[in-house]
């Protein structure tokens, strides 16, 4: 399934809902479940749907496999109705199925935590070669990652701000894994069963600020935490595969800049999740980025985006994630006197 979070306009203002992409439609899963329960003769279908298939992605992930099973039943029920040219309605006449153009797709979830790895060897080798040194042997000991700002999330077709303190704005084309079950001290094999699915991540970067931070052995901080692109949907493991190997492409203003394979990672998802879980708990809704593939960023390509450019990441099975790059405010420099 392709799970989404979407916004629908109502007379009471915009509502945010959990949905699934089906053909050219977006199905409201909570209301589809309520319609199904009403069809089965349940006395309180809305209350049952809210308990078993809540309309919020994080609450849905918290319920694990049972909620996923209910989502499949709800989607099948809605699809069967559409196949008979009879769009299902909620118990109070609510609209269950929407045209894609009638809703606004948001980021599929608000991550509870965000970690981003450095899992592609060729990209890592290139990064150290640029600095005039060889890749540290410790890179091969265990997967390296940093913790990002999980609150600065930009969904599909949003404008991403250009920080006033950078002249080297960049993108990084990545796939992200979404955790679906709580786990701690997981083995590599156990970790696979804790994956809810995958989505596309654009790890936006201020390269000049990153250079300053990393030179002091800290960060990235301001070099990364201003924006992360996420979306358009959360594709479940059965559809994407537990160790997805998909073509990923970078398009800028309609021009293909680069392409690669997501499966070229040095580290597997099972190992990366297992590593994070050692003496630390993973929670549903945690998001882990893979890091970018070689030539999956402007730095590797030695090409830079400009204000107003449109950056689009396309990944087989996962969809397309587009963002417009905003215009910077007056240039500032983050350099201070002591105090």
Model regions: which residues?
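Active-site microenvironments in enzyme catalytic cores
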Residues: 1-12, 21, 31-252, 256
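Short N-terminal binding/cap micro-motifs at the start of the first secondary-structure element
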Residues: 11-18, 28, 322
């Amino acid at each position: 399934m392709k799970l989404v979070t979407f916004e629908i306009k109502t007379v009471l203002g915009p509502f945010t809902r959990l949905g699934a992409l089906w053909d050219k439609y977006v199905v409201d899963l909570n209301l589809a479940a309520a319609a199904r329960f009403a069809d089965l003769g349940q006395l309180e279908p809305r209350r049952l749907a809210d308990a078993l298939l809540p309309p919020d992605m994080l609450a849905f992930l918290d319920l694990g496999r049972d909620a996923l099973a209910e989502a499949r039943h709800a989607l099948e029920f809605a699809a069967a109705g559409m196949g008979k040219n009879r769009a299902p309605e909620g118990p109070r006449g609510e609209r269950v199925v929407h045209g894609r153009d009638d809703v606004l797709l948001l980021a599929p979830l608000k991550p509870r935590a965000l970690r981003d790895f450095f899992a592609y060897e060729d990209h890592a080798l290139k990064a150290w070669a640029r600095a005039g040194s060889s890749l540290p042997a410790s890179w091969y000991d265990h997967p390296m990652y940093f913790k990002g700002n999980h609150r600065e999330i930009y969904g599909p077709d949003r404008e991403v701000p250009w920080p006033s303190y950078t002249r080297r704005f960049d993108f990084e084309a990545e796939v992200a894994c979404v955790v679906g079950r709580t786990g701690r001290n997981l083995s590599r094999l156990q970790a696979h069963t804790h994956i809810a699915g995958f989505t596309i991540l654009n790890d936006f970067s201020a390269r000049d600020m990153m250079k300053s931070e990393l030179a002091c052995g800290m960060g990235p901080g301001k070099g990364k935490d201003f924006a992360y692109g996420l979306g358009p949907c959360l594709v479940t493991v059965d559809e994407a595969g537990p160790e997805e190997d998909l073509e990923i492409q970078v398009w800028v203003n309609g021009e293909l800049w680069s392409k690669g394979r997501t499966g070229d990672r040095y580290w597997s998802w099972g190992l990366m999740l297992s590593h994070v879980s050692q003496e630390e708990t993973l929670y549903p809704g945690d998001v882990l980025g893979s890091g970018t593939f070689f030539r999956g960023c402007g730095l590797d390509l030695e090409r830079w985006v400009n204000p107003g450019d449109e950056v689009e990441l396309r990944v087989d099975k996962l969809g397309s994630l587009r963002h417009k790059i905003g215009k910077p405010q007056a240039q500032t420099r983050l350099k201070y006197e002591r105090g």
